[in-house]
Amino acid sequence: MKHAQKPRLVKTKWGFYQYDPMPSDEELYDYYAHKYYQTGQGSYSPEYLNEEIAYFQLKANLIYIKASQLSNIQPGAKLIDIGCGEGWIMDEFYKRGLSVSGLDFSKHGIEKFHPHLLTFFDQGNIFEKIQKTLSDGILFDVVILANVIEHVKEPVLLLEEIKKCMGPCALLIIVAPNDFSALHQILIEKKIIPRKFWLCYPDHLSYFNRNSMINLLSDFGYSILATVADNPIDLNLFNENSNYIKDPSKGKNTHLFRVRMDNFLADINIEKLLTIYETLGAMGVGRNLTYYCSIEK
């Protein structure tokens, strides 16, 4: 992706970072519609081990459990998954009886892993699809935005548009990488890692940590009901034997450690595992953070 001017990181007034200038809409559409899932970019892979699939299903289950604790989610409630990817979260709520809709640039991921959801899937530009939803007057009880906000050129506009399609008691669930975190600062300051590995243009265009995300959401009229972490895989970087940034060959085994650890702990008690990750989320520790939000009354 070529630009006349090299993109640079700019800190916003809310504390999160964005690239400037941004890639064009055409470049991004081509990237996501034709390259992202098919070539295994980001966290996506053309194939997964059975234990990895169990891990993805577990993460979706944890999101459902927490959402049901915070909101009276009934069968038949309307859910929209904006940027539904391979469909793991969408499928979890579908199995619970919700009326689901999914949007994404590409159908490749959902077609491969959850083809039964294609009936509820709409492919194209997510901003255009949200506008169509608004023009149809549809309001949702649950809105999922999982690992999407970091990819879009206008995250602020996206949050404004989402708010318009939320019902009065709706729940917005945002999953985002926890970047420029306190842990990342220490890893860089102590030279434990040689580079800011989380920077990945044009895949991620904005970078949030707990504080900056809460600043942004609060400023646009959202109440943050809970912040929940996922596995803090970055803590492995403190150990030279599992420093997958210095030695990328250690990455696969470290990832599988995360997968097996979470699957094992969930088998013992999934509710207690959720409690662990709620504690870490409150501390701002975790590779991803999940924000459960409602509209301020």
Task: State the predicted function of each range.
Residues 1-146, 155-159, 229, 254-265, ...:
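Conserved N-terminal segment of class I S-adenosyl-L-methionine
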Residues 145, 153-161, 171-292:
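S-adenosyl-L-methionine-dependent methyltransferase catalytic module, highlighting the catalytic core
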Residues 164-168:
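Conserved helix-to-beta-strand junction in the class I
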